[in-house]
Amino acid sequence: MIDFSTFRSAVKPKERTDRYNILSAMFVLNAHVKSVTATEISKFLKLHLGTKAPINVNASLRAYDADVSPTDSGPPIQWSLTTSGLDHLRSLSGLSLSVTADDSFESDIGIVCALEYPELAAVLKAVGGATAWKELGDTRHAHVYREAQILAKSGTTLRVVSTTSTSMGLTAAAIATTQLVLQFRPRLVAMIGIAAGTRSGGKQFGDILVADPSVDYNSGKVVLENGIREFQPDPYPIGLNPRVRSVLQKYGSTHEVFQEIRARWHGRAPTAPNRLYLGPVGAADQVIDDATRVLEIQKNWRKLMGVEMETYGVYRAVHESPEPKPRAVSFKAVCDFAAEKSDSWQNYAAFMAAEFAIEFFKREWTALWPTK
């Protein structure tokens, strides 16, 4: 994917006209795939050019009738980059601008949840409530998709598509993720939900676990040695994109964002502040209600932070998706400690996971995707 700085460096300073900057911004914003508004273009240019950004983008678009075309009369008017505009941009920049479907993202964030309630319900509420979302997608597909927009702190409008897998577990999560990626081509896929935490490190209900890596702890070989059946683990761990990891590390202690989120919760909450943990999280198709089983897993992963049932399927599906590959991240909040399970903290954990994930994207999107 070509970023805005590439367009800037492709021509001499005197050739960076308003027309060139606006057409370049439209290409980076994927206006050749889905239309954008003058406001979106203006905010993008102000973010990258500051006071040197074009003053009246709306008037400029109306003047570039050979290069751009209104696709929706609005309000606001939606604009697309035409074939003529692409050719003009190619001739000005000297860049080969491929516009095939396989070379373009079509949405920003894809969200996968294992459960409609409480996990997806918390996500819908974190993005303005159910009325802020609209259903979309082909009814021939098994999954129901909802679309909404969130406004990042930078002023960028992000297209968000959410879905739930048809059941809990790695296979269902991998299928849901694959279908979402192929249909909506998001830049980033986020698994949001609840998990069981390990007792080490003073974790408490509502703490956020970000899997880095996610480990399929049931992957391996069962052998019989000296009459004793033994499991020999042989997992293929999948970690975070380095940039995503670096940005998340800023939230690795009692960050003030957790106090802000806690203030929006009206119900029982832990006494100590919540925080984020970044490290290994195990995944497998089994519900664990036995603390000794967690200890067995920790023999192989001493820094294990928790266990759950979906993230590895999401990470693996993204890892093996077509180019351009999205990035993947998982936000799972602690709802129990894999023993004496109870539903009493699930709503709070789902709330914390959803609210933190959306707040993180709002605050850090330009850090995750500097060109957007």
Where are each of the predicted segments found?
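Short acidic, hydrophobic short linear motifs in intrinsically disordered regions
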Residues: 32-45
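Helix-turn-helix/winged-helix DNA-binding modules
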Residues: 33, 49, 76-77
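Short amphipathic alpha-helical interaction segments
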Residues: 49-63
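A short, conserved structural fragment
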Residues: 62-75
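Intrinsic-disorder/coil detector with helix-boundary
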Residues: 94-371
